[in-house]
Amino acid sequence: MANLIVVCGPQAVGKMTVAESLRDKLRYNMMMNHDSIELSDRIFGFATPAQREYNAVIREKAFELAVKHHVDLIFTYVCAFDIPEERDYLMKLKDQFKDGGGEFYFVELSADLETRLARNETPHRMERKASKRDVAWSRENLLKDAEKYRLNSAEGEYWFEHHLKIDNTNLDPDEVADRVIAAFHLTAREKTEKEYRFGV
């Protein structure tokens, strides 16, 4: 069996750093949404039809193999809660891992816009995400999406049995990870470092 933890929230809310902390505390493997985005962008260009299709193929195969080979996974994702297809996609992921005998956990992060704009320009973010190094474009994209989409759920809106909401405006990643682990009663796996964080 394989568990999936989806760390969700708007751009620059802190998904990557929280996921990294969860990875190190739980010894789960990790796939950022930008892992597949950056690769498909390099090959097919930004937001082209081929890029979108290849990005989806990479993710689908990763989830398939995680379930097949019993690899616990953390996945970061930006969700537009006002688009029905987003819920359909996440429900499909939930069913995929539950049908394989695992569990599905949904962690939703939120932070105020000022905090997100500051986090958008951190050196760690620039290092890990090549597409964010054009700071002016990245800032404009963040502001545009904040205006266009509902990137956090409404008060009292819960999509999943295991759906945890955390405002991490004033929390560091380790504090958030500890809350997630406690809320879902998660335990660390027995893995060597090379099995879950090779090359990072």
Residue map of PLM features:
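Conserved phosphate-donor/acceptor-positioning beta-strand/loop module used by diverse small-molecule
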Residues: 98-121, 166
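Conserved glycine(s) of the Walker
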Residues: 14
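Small-molecule kinase domains that catalyze NTP-dependent phosphoryl transfer to phosphate-bearing small molecules
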Residues: 122-176, 197-200
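C-terminal accessory "lid"/substrate-recognition subdomains
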Residues: 182-200
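Hydrophobic anchor at the beta1->P-loop junction of P-loop NTPases
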Residues: 7
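Conserved substrate/cofactor phosphate-moiety recognition/catalytic segment
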Residues: 17-67
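The conserved Walker
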Residues: 11
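Glycine-rich phosphate-binding loop used to anchor ATP phosphates in small-molecule kinases
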Residues: 54-108
